Amino acid sequence: MFENIYIQQRIEKANKLREDGINPYSNESSRNCTISKYLNVNSDIFQLEEKRDENRNYTVAGRIKFFRLMGKASFLKIEDESGMLQIYVARDNLPENFYNEVFKKNIEVGDIIEISGYPFVTGHGELSLHADSLKILTKAISPLPEKFHGIQDKELRYRQRYLDLIMNSEVRKTFHIRSKVISLTRRFFENKGFLEVETPMMHPIAGGANAKPFVTHFNALGVDRFLRIAPELYLKRLIVGGFEAVFEINRNFRNEGMDATHNPEFTSIEFYWAYKTYKDLIVLTKEYFEYLFENLNLPTILPYGEFKIDFNKFSEIPLIQSLYEIGGVPQDIVEDKDKILAFLKANNLEANANLNLGQLQGELFDEFVEAKLINPTFITEYPVEISPLARRSDEKPHLTDRFELFIAGKEIANAFSELNDPIDQLQRFEGQIAAKEAGDDEAHEMDEDFVNALSYGMAPTAGQGIGIDRLVMMLTNEHSIRDVLLFPAMKPIKQEIDLYSEEK
């Protein structure tokens, strides 16, 4: 594994440190200041006449990102999570022979070191640290990529995220924002009186959304289990039990394709609110975005690729209406199954003739409308046939009290007034079974226990899911879901395939 000549040279240096009585993997650090704090508390040095203060002493630590070795003195740049700092190392300020025998011969870019010293400003006007002592904390035996400003190979970045994080500070910034989004999301719902809960990750029935599940086996019980597609049915059981506002932030798993907006495991928040409707959730969603933007200090008009997304403008339009007003689909065909099939065929699009009208309307939306929804848009009134868990509209029984929120052509949220009629729910599940038999692999399974829960009475409730990954993509101007996941799913490399074959 470590046959590379450059790695071998670094291993030799680590061994030389050991021979000199220096542990190249020390477990003790005396750091008392992060780099950002050092730069902040010493900003007044620029105002001092001598541009230095030898009475101050700080100990910082970080990875060497740049090394300019000179005769009796050297300049380094080290980086910790908070920032980068220039270090001045002079031979005569270190213990005898340390500079020539240890520092110059065995320390290099990539190593993690600890330095103590005082602040000063260089002749070029850069606040730096004048080293009085230096200690190696971790010897890196693999050299960093040559490019100081990072690695450009995306495949390598995703497979070796640790290396990507070392080399690209902007990547670290993205994941700081992601973490803050999750933290703010939790705080927003807690402030609204919601209770955070945890529900099972392994389900006896693949349910909660229309998707293909991952299957595993529970050895102790001798039964198969499904990694959860969505937590919806368990959260609604809690509403039946008497909790009136619950949320869960966690992973979901869908055994489907990967692309710029889909990863087999992803993070979402789902929340359910008793005595509310989907219209209340539209208001809540707007408040949520306002809260995020305020606390992230983001402008309300954000660039996203070629677009500028205006988060001051949330529009709302029924799905059927969007087909002809936004998608350009002829208005006279949108309620006729045969005409839709002919229209799809005329546009060189495949359509299963076994699909019902609502499913075909969904196909039209996916093909002709979704990508055009740039500014935040609530698409409402989805057909019953593609909304097996949503409540029927009282005014239009063939439609549901549902919305999906789209931004930059991507679905960000899905919400509806919940179906709480157990008989209607049973019939919907039976319809989904028929759809599965007709070839719909993603149709919902029958869940008799959930129907039984509804039979005890569930208060009028509205529920919603928001995809955290896609939301972070919008907020950070990233165009692949892999760029907002620390460790995205990747195709196995040849060694992994060979190892798996041997184990089998």
UniProtKB/Swiss-Prot annotation:
Q: Predominant location of this chain? A: cytoplasm
User: Keyword set for this entry?
Assistant: Aminoacyl-tRNA synthetase, ATP-binding, Cytoplasm, Ligase, Magnesium, Metal-binding, Nucleotide-binding, Protein biosynthesis
TM regions (residue ranges): none
Extract one GO cellular component term from the record: cytosol
- Residues binding Mg(2+) 1: E404, E411
EC number of this enzyme: 6.1.1.6
Q: Does the keyword DNA-binding apply?
A: no
Pfam families the record matches: tRNA-synt_2 (PF00152), tRNA_anti-codon (PF01336)
Source organism superkingdom: Bacteria
Cofactor binding description: Binds 3 Mg(2+) ions per subunit.
Question: Which PANTHER family does the UniProt record give?
Answer: LYSINE--TRNA LIGASE, CHLOROPLASTIC_MITOCHONDRIAL, LYSYL-TRNA SYNTHETASE
Which NCBIfam families does this entry report, sorted A to Z? lysS_bact, PRK00484.1
What HAMAP family does the record point to? Lys_tRNA_synth_class2 (MF_00252)
* UniProt name for this protein: Lysine--tRNA ligase
Which organism does this sequence originate in?
Aliarcobacter butzleri (strain RM4018)
**Which lineage is the organism of this entry classified under, starting from the top rank?**
Bacteria, Pseudomonadati, Campylobacterota, Epsilonproteobacteria, Campylobacterales
Gene from which this protein is expressed = lysS
